């Protein structure tokens, strides 16, 4: 099957879960799963097809509160049964998360799906991958830098801000603007 799938939204509310609070807590606890958020929001029109084997209960078990999703974009191009992420991101009041990769419906597999918490320049701060079959996906641990240096992450951010010319490999450069 070939085609396109699109989901866009503004000023959405997710009741029962404070995403910004959980992401802030992540910096000190390292206990958060970006893939939960990515799969829930970004798969959009394709989500119900691929998430049968995925348990979202962990996303809603511990938080309370609510999240304001300022902007959501989920644009996918489908060729030969593989949906490739195009402009796939969302921004809350304080954070921006983006997704890359594909959903292989022919082989029922995640194709190099990567979810990242990104800064204002589109540079990844935390990266997490999802691999394997739709029925039993494997969520890899967050990138090594953040896992090892989690409690020091705030210091690294402050140091980087002192040298604004620092370079990064841009993960996302799409339509979803960073939080103000």
PLM features: residue spans?
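Extended terminal
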Residues: 1-180
């Amino acid at each position: 099957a070939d085609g396109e799938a699109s989901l866009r939204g503004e000023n959405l509310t997710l009741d029962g879960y404070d995403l910004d609070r959980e992401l802030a807590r992540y910096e000190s606890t390292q206990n958060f799963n970006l893939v939960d958020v990515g799969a829930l929001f970004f798969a959009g029109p394709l989500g119900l097809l691929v998430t049968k084997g995925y348990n979202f209960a962990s996303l809603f078990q511990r938080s309370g509160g609510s999240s304001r999703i300022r902007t959501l974009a989920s644009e996918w191009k489908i060729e030969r049964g593989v949906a490739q992420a195009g402009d796939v991101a969302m921004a809350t009041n304080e954070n921006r998360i983006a997704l890359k990769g594909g959903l292989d419906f022919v082989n029922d597999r995640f194709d190099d799906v990567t979810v990242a918490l990104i800064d204002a320049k589109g540079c990844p701060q935390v990266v997490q991958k999802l691999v394997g079959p739709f029925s039993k996906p494997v969520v890899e641990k967050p990138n090594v830098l953040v896992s090892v240096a989690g409690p020091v992450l705030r210091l690294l951010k402050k140091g980087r801000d002192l040298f604004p010319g620092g370079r990064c490999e841009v993960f996302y450069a799409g339509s979803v603007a960073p939080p103000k």
